[in-house]
């Protein structure tokens, strides 16, 4: 049964609101689900419940809790889309990494689940990459992560498996940025990159106008196989 919980932030900063979905039996592992700039909306909750159905404990933290708590926005509604952009402009990704670390510690110590993965979308895809470079999570997956090309210098710190889903027509990630990601990460033994020809940002959304059914199903199947291999 999904519930809303709070997770202690690092350094006593406060409490991170989070959405929690758990399987009916002991979880095989935990997955931290990092949302797009639209917050823990219905689409992210659907993804959490899907992971629970596959036997994982899923935790989706409210990444904007410091200045816009409770944001649940719809990308297909223009004023809400613009609010999401405004939230992103205020956001400090370093705080996001701290929140991922806080969630991982919570899952391991309070939930008693030792293996932890991260899956993120858009801004969350960038944070999934940063989690792979800066934390000890066991595996990470990023969908259409933004600004990863600006952080390739951190790739040498990746010690656990990372998978990135890259739509080639992503209007937020230029072809030059995609080329840089491939040049920087293709040689890395822990990194797997998948391109999706002609697809755009948000293609794996749970619903809405951005979703591409075939591409979403393919990417999600690859993610499930990846986590099954590296988390159990």
Please report, for each region that a protein language model flagged, where it lies by residue.
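N-terminal cap/leader regions of alpha/beta-hydrolase-fold enzymes
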Residues: 1-232
């Amino acid at each position: 049964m999904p519930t809303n919980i709070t997770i202690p932030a690092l350094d006593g900063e406060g409490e991170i609101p989070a959405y929690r979905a758990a399987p009916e039996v002991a979880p095989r592992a935990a997955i931290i689900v990092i949302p797009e700039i639209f917050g823990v909306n219905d689409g992210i909750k659907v993804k959490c419940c899907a992971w629970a159905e596959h036997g994982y404990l899923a935790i989706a933290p409210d990444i904007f809790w410091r200045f816009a708590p409770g944001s649940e926005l719809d990308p297909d509604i223009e004023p809400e889309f613009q609010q999401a952009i405004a939230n992103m402009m205020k956001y400090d990704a370093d705080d996001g990494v701290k929140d991922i670390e806080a969630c991982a510690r919570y899952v391991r110590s309070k939930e008693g689940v030792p293996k932890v993965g991260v899956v993120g979308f858009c801004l969350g895809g960038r944070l999934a990459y940063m989690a792979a470079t800066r934390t000890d999570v066991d595996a990470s997956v990023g969908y259409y992560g933004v600004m990863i090309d600006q952080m390739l210098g951190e790739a040498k710190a990746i010690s656990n498996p990372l998978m990135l889903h890259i739509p080639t027509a992503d209007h937020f990630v230029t072809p030059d940025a995609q080329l840089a990601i491939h040049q920087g990460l293709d040689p890395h033994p822990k990194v797997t990159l998948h391109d999706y020809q002609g697809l755009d940002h948000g293609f794996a959304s749970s619903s809405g106008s951005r979703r591409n059914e075939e591409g979403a199903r393919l990417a999600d199947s690859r993610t499930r196989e990846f986590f099954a291999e590296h988390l159990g």
